[in-house]
Amino acid sequence: MKESFYIEGMTCTACSSGIERSLGRKSFVKKIEVSLLNKSANIEFNENETNLDEIFKLIEKLGYSPKKTLAEEKKEFFSPNVKLALAVIFTLFVVYLSMGAMLSPSLLPESLLTINNHSNFLNACLQLIGTLIVMHLGRDFYIQGFKALWHRQPNMSSLIAIGTSAALISSLWQLYFVYTSQWSYGHYYFESVCVILMFVMVGKRIENVSKDKALDAMQALMKNAPKTALKMHNNQQIEVLVDSIVVGDILKVLPGSAIAVDGEIIEGEGELDESMLSGEALPVYKKVGDKVFSGTFNSHTSFLMKATQDNKNSTLSQIVEMIHNAQSSKAEISRLADKVSSVFVPSVIAIAILAFVVWLIIAPKPDFWWNFGIALEVFVSVLVISCPCALGLATPMSILVANQKASSLGLFFKDAKSLEKARLVNTIVFDKTGTLTNGKPVVKSVHSNIELLELLSLAGSIEKSSEHVIAKGIVEYAKEHNAPLKEMSEVKVKTGFGISAKTDYQGAKEVIKVGNSEFFNPINALEIQENGILVFVGRVISEKEDELLGAFVLEDLPKKGVKEHIAQIKKLGINTFLLSGDNRENVKKCALELGIDGYISNAKPQDKLNKIKELKEKGQIVMMVGDGLNDAPSLAMSDVAVVMAKGSDVSVQAADIVSFNNDIKSVYSAIKLSQATIKNIKENLFWAFCYNSVFIPLACGVLYKANIMLSPAIAGLAMSLSSVSVVLNSQRLRNFKIKDH
């Protein structure tokens, strides 16, 4: 069984990886992925051995709060921004008390002046009050940090909580000695505690704002979903909940309202904003017979539509599910960071303790409390400067921003692995009809042995009973030439060959057939030299003989810009193949015209499947690009499956990437975005590893002899800047652009 739920209380990747590690050890858990950014988890488990309630109890034992739905955040007395502003004000107050006299004695009243650069008792008490206020404002770090430590799952909050608590306890201890007059002054760390918490809070605020902006993509889509719709019942409009709509319901769509579910216009017309699907801002004109999709907006006039999908299976619901899965899943490249994070925090605590002991022993002055002060500063600096957040954010933040960018391009990735793997593709296999071509064959020429209008009337009358795209092309041509369409009887369809029906022909009831050459008994074929899709029209004379009445030559024209986009793809060093069930001449012509490297014609679904198998066995990483309707086996066999879709035609289950642009440019865009994303992730990881590799030893005091020591306050600033730099670098993906040539 697969379930998705939310987890509150996670602060860094050590939290998410700890939950994964703990639950992953259970025999009944098949797979679990926890997303720090989404505060969510996807789990697959054996329902015969456990249930979701038991899994929730296991997570609660680790110190986190699992929830089936993400409840609204509790309203606090202070908003995050006000809380941060207060933290900054009180931090400056404590720093002013601590260091004001060092800068200029006139800054402080005489009663608060320091003794030998050390705060007096009253000064220290005021610092303590300011520090306790700042600690209260940052209390979440202590609650979550010590809770995680108690459950043996230490995280970033644990490091901050331990470090600042140690500094506070040391300061209180020394304040006690001053109060009892055993010491004339003490060396306090109140300003260090405040500055550390302030910098961390600033960093977290910037981080959370950036996360929220990146998560806005799904929130914006959800806002497109109307809660109610106007249902027609006995010629009356009834407002109903969208969840109650079933296939076949007739709905009225008013100007300025959103489409509730996928459907088809049956009366009226409209102009729809489909930018949430395609990324194109221009409205799309829709008339009777056209499909409309959930989440799109009707700009002008009202119309009636028939629902073809319910809310659960609508286009918008599928897109939201894809975005959620993509944001919650993990890329393979993140596994390294997860492994490091699992041992990172315990290792940092061990290093901090070791550094404290070493400095206590080797400190150059014989005074114990001076040595203790140096050792404590090193201990706090090591804990505070280490940044598991930079490691944890390196991959998911880039994936999050990349998915947001993809949706603006009309692209949707199934999961992070799809986004990651697209850049590795070295062979692309294209379906032809509807993928490279318009998918709407048009009549190119007509060859007739009878009067032309009679031929058009016969063919159009029979083909109007078929839903095949070729049939629609012939019917459209007949209508354009004002051919009368007759009533048919005994209509029979032979899939893959053609259609037959009984109708009036030359004063008698005759069986007329329309289809490919294999549909007819041996006849004297017309000499047709043109390339194209051949459709014959004939009269049945006997069971063994048909009379040829004429033939249509149709062509399915390539989509605009396809040739240029394929040239772009080939410049990336990618091999291209065309697989089609069409005849050899048409497929060859299409391949040559578009500059495709190889082709296979007359290909049945099994032939396409075998070709992809063959390419993969040769070590190729294969992307299959199709329409998702009849390419499911080939799409499933490929390494990366791309479905070129228009609304509800999409088969999400078969796709790794869905393009609602229905444009080959999307394939190039997906590959380039994948490359840019992985490059961005590597930059983030490089910075995160380098930062921790360089700054942790510095905090330990390895350059003490060169007079370089990092104070706890500077360590806090460095840690905040580290995670913020990863977030800001990830945001650069927002500026990702595709060059046309």
UniProtKB/Swiss-Prot annotation:
Keywords: ATP-binding, Cell membrane, Copper, Copper transport, Ion transport, Magnesium, Membrane, Metal-binding, Nucleotide-binding, Phosphoprotein, Translocase, Transmembrane, Transmembrane helix, Transport. Residues 1-67 form the HMA domain. Mg(2+) binds at residues 627, 631. The keyword Transmembrane applies. InterPro entries: ATPase_P-typ_cyto_dom_N, ATPase_P-typ_P_site, ATPase_P-typ_TM_dom_sf, ATPase_P-typ_transduc_dom_A_sf, HAD-like_sf, HAD_sf, Heavy-metal-associated_CS, HMA_dom. Cu cation binds at residues 12, 15. Residues 1-83, 145-151, 212-339, 394-681, 732-741 are cytoplasmic. GO terms for molecular function: ATP binding; ATP hydrolysis activity; copper ion binding; P-type divalent copper transporter activity. It comes from the Bacteria. Residues 105-124, 173-190, 363-375, 702-712 are extracellular. The keyword RNA-binding does not apply. The chain crosses the membrane at residues 84-104, 125-144, 152-172, 191-211, 340-362, 376-393, 682-701, 713-731. GO terms for biological process: copper ion homeostasis; copper ion transport. It is an enzyme of class 7 (translocase). It catalyses: Cu(2+)(in) + ATP + H2O = Cu(2+)(out) + ADP + phosphate + H(+). Gene3D superfamilies: 3.30.70.100, Calcium-transporting ATPase, cytoplasmic domain N, Calcium-transporting ATPase, cytoplasmic transduction domain A, HAD superfamily/HAD-like. Belongs to the cation transport ATPase (P-type) (TC 3.A.3) family. Type IB subfamily. PANTHER family: ATP7, ISOFORM B, P-TYPE CU(+) TRANSPORTER. Probably involved in copper export. This is Copper-transporting ATPase. The gene is copA.
